[in-house]
Amino acid sequence: MTAVQAARRARIERRTKESDIVIELDLDGTGRVDVETGVPFYDHMLTALGSHASFDLTVRTTGDVEIEAHHTIEDTAIALGAALGQALGDKRGIRRFGDAFIPMDETLAHAAVDVSGRPYCVHSGEPDHLQHSTIAGSSVPYHTVINRHVFESLAMNARIALHVRVLYGRDPHHITEAQYKAVARALRQAVEPDPRVSDVPSTKGVL
């Protein structure tokens, strides 16, 4: 394992009056994921993200889900972004850019990532009905209107540029999951060590 790979781990603890979060992340893992947020569909999405990014990821979140899942989902995305930024360190030797198209049945989603140090998020293409759709396989439902906020929180706190778009789709579950998986695959490419690059992949010399 190279020096670039050896240090690419992070542990983030984030505590507020609304949530208590511990995240452990290894960018050079094999997709071992263990997620408990109290929001079962969000667990499913973060498990997909970690698995398809080939990250080792442990998430433990206790939040005020008796009010609503929003705080738990948002705060976990903030902490995950912070963990990603911490694990990347000075970003030496990474590919920096990544993108992926992910189909899921009738849905097609695309994500593009630049590990630029300049946080930005563009999210587009979700059908209007996702503004009021609920995925409710448990007592703590996931409202798909939160999708954009998850990606924004991840990008802002990881300090990456993230573009996520839905080209087409119908089922809220498929649309949401395809986006998480597209982000995962794009991140996997972007943070991967580049054997031809030993320095920071920027003409500025810093990211």
Swiss-Prot record:
One of its GO terms (cellular component) is cytoplasm. It is found in: Cytoplasm. Its EC number is 4.2.1.19. PROSITE patterns: IGP_DEHYDRATASE_1, IGP_DEHYDRATASE_2. The keyword Amino-acid biosynthesis applies. It catalyses: D-erythro-1-(imidazol-4-yl)glycerol 3-phosphate = 3-(imidazol-4-yl)-2-oxopropyl phosphate + H2O. GO terms for molecular function: imidazoleglycerol-phosphate dehydratase activity. The keyword RNA-binding does not apply. Keywords: Amino-acid biosynthesis, Cytoplasm, Histidine biosynthesis, Lyase. GO terms for biological process: L-histidine biosynthetic process. Pathway: Amino-acid biosynthesis; L-histidine biosynthesis; L-histidine from 5-phospho-alpha-D-ribose 1-diphosphate: step 6/9. It comes from the Bacteria. Belongs to the imidazoleglycerol-phosphate dehydratase family. This is Imidazoleglycerol-phosphate dehydratase. The gene is hisB.
